[in-house]
């Protein structure tokens, strides 16, 4: 189940609601149950469910879920199997102590609250094996069919008129060597077809038999004999209601759910897993799959739309017992926390508008349309809206023909403007004409639609004429002019009484048909872009990208735009600079012209240098560098002179050392913009020291010394990592020489200790643990001996250090006495 189910498309079109007023016994007390399945009841009293418990009680649930209870005969044990017929007769199988079985037929039509249902027929027989399944049904209230499947592959069959005691009319037949776990009848009641068929499913194998009177099973058909997978559950899907044309046997295996007809195997649905239950309601197949990946008793309930091949519901239930299916409803029975009852749930379909919205969100337009057709909304505004959205989706995918077909089906519901506005481009001309033609057939044509149809027809004629002419063979100016006129009429087809084409529309036309139109008549088309349609500078760069092969034209057009809009985006200036560089490479402009353009428009130097180097424009790059250097020197000299004069005139005032010259000038300009503000008033922005141009050398030397010390420590740490691989980590404590356990401490110096052997609390220094051996060495070194305090007031501290040294010496002598080398390599990390 885990693999195949994830491959299906999923949309939750159902939900679960609780049916609290139905009281069903706990599953531990139920011995068997049955319901009509797809059998059609013609009686007024419709029975939904029959439950037989282990206390010989028979619970009958009516159509309104009212429950009537009565007991089976006192001489019988608990009922083991039961089956409900289409005329409300209940067939039961009760075993006895002699390995025999009692078969009783109850007439539920005569059941009342005060009087139990009477037994109208009974039989007793000795089966050859344990009964596993039971099915019973009637044909025109004349023939009664009853079949019991046994564990050894045999069947007990009664087929004929029912009598008070029909024990003598029961026949035993052998089907296969595997246990029979399902029996289903398919009775034909048409005058031309009276064939009575019985399907039998075994643990391995599916068979079909023709029934005849006197309990004869004739003409055995082996529908499936696959021994690779076991048959878990099976149901009969009856024809009728206009939803299913032929009756089918539905069998659930571990690999999939298979359907069979008397002619052979039918559809197959790839849902893997052990099948706990099967049901068929309308177009929906309901499958309960046992989840083998969980230790707990969990079952995944899957509802499959067999027509659209999608999963419309999927939910996991704990201890799912069984599923009750009807023509339009499905009920789910699960165990609850209450030991005396079960939970009754109903599988309910969402409202049609919610389901359509969910399908449209996942772009399942075809399924949404079929669902609307199934619900009777074939010609409705809701369906037209879905078709309009479907047409938009197809248009974006490039399927113009199918999109137009969907748009045509919306005529009468969707406003024509909504469709026409999407098909106005030249490449949609044929599809727009088809839509307008269909719209004209169903509606009265207006003058606007007539002119639009004429425009589309004219476009088709011009396109046809252009396709017949090959402009490469034209040498006559008159013919070229004629073809240019056709091109302009086709690509920019605008009636004389309408406004000119907008710039965005012209841009789309150029994207579609630019190469063809430029090849026919370059001047006319480019002039149309420049003078007629380009009224703003926002889209001009899009035209420049399309016309990349026409550098001269683009440069002139950009120059005109920049001249018309002096305060334009800097991006336009750099695009124009790029075009000038391309023309300079072709010797169409001089280097002086390009340099003058750069100086005139004051372009950013960093971007200008990058672009000029890209086009190997080095001579002007050198000029720019020289000009920038001279300008920078003059700028700095001016600032220094200004600061010097300010400090000279105000000796008590000094600048902040972190204040840049540029910031200082900006502050000075904003402060002294009026004559009322004097230099003394801006004193708070200065400090009592002059602006320093160099860093304090003493602080710099101290920083260098600190960084060198940090580098030295890092190198030492790195050396320990590189010289001590993990393979040679110490495995014994350096104090007790016992094997190290999980509670151990490792140091980078290659020493390791037990946690209880190392008194790390006494060696804690600045929140760092120190090795007891290495610390002893450091304390014995001469550089540490001078650190002892000789002050009489610190006697306790001196004694503590001396005692500590003695302890370390004793430890060191003990380690040397063991002749353990201190050079053992180890990894300090566990």
Curated annotation (Swiss-Prot):
The record's section on PROSITE patterns has:
ZF_RING_2 (PS50089)
Report the record's Gene Ontology biological process terms.
autophagosome maturation; cellular response to starvation; endosomal transport; endosomal vesicle fusion; endosome organization; lysosomal transport; organelle fusion; protein transport
Record's keyword terms, sorted:
Autophagy, Endosome, Lysosome, Membrane, Metal-binding, Protein transport, Transport, Zinc, Zinc-finger
**UniProt-listed InterPro entries:** Znf_RING, Znf_RING/FYVE/PHD
- GO MF annotations in UniProt: protein-macromolecule adaptor activity; ubiquitin protein ligase activity; ubiquitin-protein transferase activity; zinc ion binding
Q: What is its main location?
A: membrane
Q: Does the keyword Zinc apply?
A: yes
Gene deleted: what happens? Answer: Impaired autophagosome clearance in fat body cells of starved 3rd instar (L3) larvae. Conditional RNAi-mediated knock-down in muscle cells disrupts transverse-tubule (T-tubule) and myofibril remodeling in internal oblique muscles during metamorphosis.
Query: Zn finger regions (RING-type) covering which residues?
Result: 733-775
Gene Ontology cellular component annotations, sorted alphabetically: endosome; HOPS complex; late endosome membrane; lysosomal membrane
Membrane topology term reads: Peripheral membrane protein
Q: Name one Pfam family in it.
A: TPR_PEP5_VPS11
Where does this polypeptide localize? Answer: Late endosome membrane; Lysosome membrane
Which PANTHER family does the record match to this protein? VACUOLAR PROTEIN SORTING-ASSOCIATED PROTEIN (PTHR23323), VACUOLAR PROTEIN SORTING-ASSOCIATED PROTEIN 11 HOMOLOG (PTHR23323:SF24)
Q: How does it assemble?
A: Part of the homotypic fusion and vacuole protein sorting (HOPS) complex, composed of Vps16A, car/Vps33A, dor/Vps18, Vps39, Vps11 and lt/Vps41. Unlike in other species, not part of the class C core vacuole/endosome tethering (CORVET) complex.
Which family does the similarity line name?
A: Belongs to the VPS11 family.
- State the function annotated in the UniProt record: Part of the homotypic fusion and vacuole protein sorting (HOPS) tethering complex involved in endo-lysosomal vesicle trafficking and lysosome biogenesis, but unlike in many other species does not form part of the class C core vacuole/endosome tethering (CORVET) complex. The HOPS complex facilitates docking and fusion of lysosomes with late endosomes and several other types of vesicles. The HOPS complex is also involved in autophagy, pigment granule biogenesis and crinophagy (the elimination of unused secretory granules through fusion with lysosomes).
What's the protein here called?
Vacuolar protein sorting-associated protein 11 homolog
- Organism from which the protein derives: Drosophila melanogaster
């Amino acid at each position: 189940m885990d693999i195949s189910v994830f491959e299906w498309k999923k949309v939750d079109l159902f939900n679960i609601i609780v049916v609290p007023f139905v009281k069903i016994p706990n599953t531990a007390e139920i011995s068997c149950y049955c319901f009509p399945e797809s059998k059609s009841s013609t009686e007024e009293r419709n029975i939904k469910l029959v439950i037989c418990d282990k206390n010989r009680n028979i619970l009958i649930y009516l159509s309104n879920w009212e429950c009537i209870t009565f007991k089976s005969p006192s001489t019988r044990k608990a009922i083991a199997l039961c089956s409900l017929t289409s005329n409300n007769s209940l067939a039961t199988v009760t075993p006895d102590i002699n390995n025999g079985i009692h078969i009783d037929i109850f007439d539920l039509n005569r059941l009342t609250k005060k009087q139990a249902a009477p037994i109208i027929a009974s039989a007793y027989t000795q089966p050859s094996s344990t009964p596993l399944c039971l099915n019973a049904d009637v044909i025109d209230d004349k023939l009664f069919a009853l079949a019991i499947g046994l564990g050894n592959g045999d069947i007990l069959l009664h087929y004929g008129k029912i009598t008070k005691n029909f024990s003598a009319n029961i026949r035993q037949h052998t089907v296969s060597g595997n246990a029979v776990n399902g029996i289903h009848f398919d009775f034909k009641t048409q005058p031309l077809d009276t064939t009575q068929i019985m399907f039998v499913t075994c643990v391995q194998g599916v068979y079909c038999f023709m029934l005849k009177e006197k309990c004869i099973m004739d003409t055995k058909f082996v529908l499936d004999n696959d021994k690779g997978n076991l048959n878990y559950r099976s149901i009969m899907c009856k024809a009728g209601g206009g939803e299913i044309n032929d009756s089918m046997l539905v069998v659930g295996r571990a690999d999939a759910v298979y359907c069979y007809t008397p002619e052979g195997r039918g559809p197959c649905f790839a849902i893997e897993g052990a099948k706990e239950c099967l049901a068929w309601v309308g177009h929906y197949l309901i499958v309960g799959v046992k989840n083998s990946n969980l230790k707990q008793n969990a079952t995944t309930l899957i509802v499959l739309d067999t027509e659209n091949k999608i999963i419309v519901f999927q939910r996991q239930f704990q201890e799912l017992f069984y599923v009750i299916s009807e023509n339009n409803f499905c009920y789910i029975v699960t165990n609850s926390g209450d030991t005396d009852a079960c939970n009754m749930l109903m599988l309910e379909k969402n409202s049609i508008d919610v389901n359509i919205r969910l399908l449209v969100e996942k772009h399942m337009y075809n399924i949404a349309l079929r669902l609307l057709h199934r619900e009777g909304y074939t010609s409705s505004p809701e369906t037209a809206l879905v078709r309009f959205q479907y047409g938009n989706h197809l248009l974006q995918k490039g399927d113009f023909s199918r999109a137009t077909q969907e748009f045509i089906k919306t005529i009468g519901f969707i406003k024509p403007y909504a469709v026409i506005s999407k098909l106005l481009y030249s490449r949609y001309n044929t599809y727009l004409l088809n839509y307008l033609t269909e719209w004209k057939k169903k509606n009265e044509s207006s003058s606007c639609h007539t002119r639009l149809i004429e425009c589309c027809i004219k476009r088709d004629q011009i396109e046809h004429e252009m396709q017949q002419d090959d402009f490469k063979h034209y040498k006559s100016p008159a013919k070229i002019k004629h073809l240019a006129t056709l091109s302009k009429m086709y690509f920019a087809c605008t009636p004389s009484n309408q406004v000119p084409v907008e710039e965005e529309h012209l841009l789309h036309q150029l994207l579609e048909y630019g190469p063809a139109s430029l090849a026919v008549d370059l001047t006319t088309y480019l002039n149309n872009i420049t003078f007629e349609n380009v009224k703003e500078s926002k889209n001009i760069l899009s035209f420049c990208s399309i016309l990349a092969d026409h550098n001269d034209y683009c440069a002139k057009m950009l120059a005109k735009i920049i001249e018309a809009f002096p305060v334009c985006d800097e991006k336009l200036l750099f695009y124009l600079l790029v075009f000038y560089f391309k023309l300079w490479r072709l010797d169409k402009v001089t280097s002086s012209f390009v340099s003058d353009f750069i100086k005139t428009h004051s372009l950013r130097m960093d971007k200008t240098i990058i672009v000029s180097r890209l086009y190997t424009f080095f001579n002007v790059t050198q000029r720019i560098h020289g000009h920038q250097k001279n300008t920078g020197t003059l700028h700095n000299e001016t600032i220094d002179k200004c600061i010097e004069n300010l400090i000279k005139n105000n000796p008590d005032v000094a600048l902040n050392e972190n204040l840049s010259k540029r910031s200082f000038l900006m502050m000075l300009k904003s402060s002294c913009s009026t004559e009322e503000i004097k230099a003394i008033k801006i004193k708070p922005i200065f400090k009592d020291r002059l602006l320093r141009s160099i860093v304090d050398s003493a602080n710099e030397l101290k920083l260098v010394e600190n960084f060198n010390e940090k580098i030295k420590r890092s190198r030492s740490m790195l050396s320990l990592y590189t010289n001590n691989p993990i393979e040679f980590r110490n495995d014994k404590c350096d104090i007790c020489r016992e094997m190290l356990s999980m509670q151990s401490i490792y140091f980078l110096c290659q020493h390791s200790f037990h946690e209880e052997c190392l008194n790390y609390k006494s060696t804690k220094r600045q929140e760092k643990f120190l090795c007891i051996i290495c610390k002893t060495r450091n304390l014995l070194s001469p550089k540490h001996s001078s650190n002892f305090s000789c002050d009489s007031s610190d006697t306790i501290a001196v004694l503590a250090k001396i005692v500590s040294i003695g302890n370390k010496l004793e430890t060191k002598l003990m380690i040397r006495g063991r002749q353990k080398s201190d050079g053992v390599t180890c990894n300090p990390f566990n």
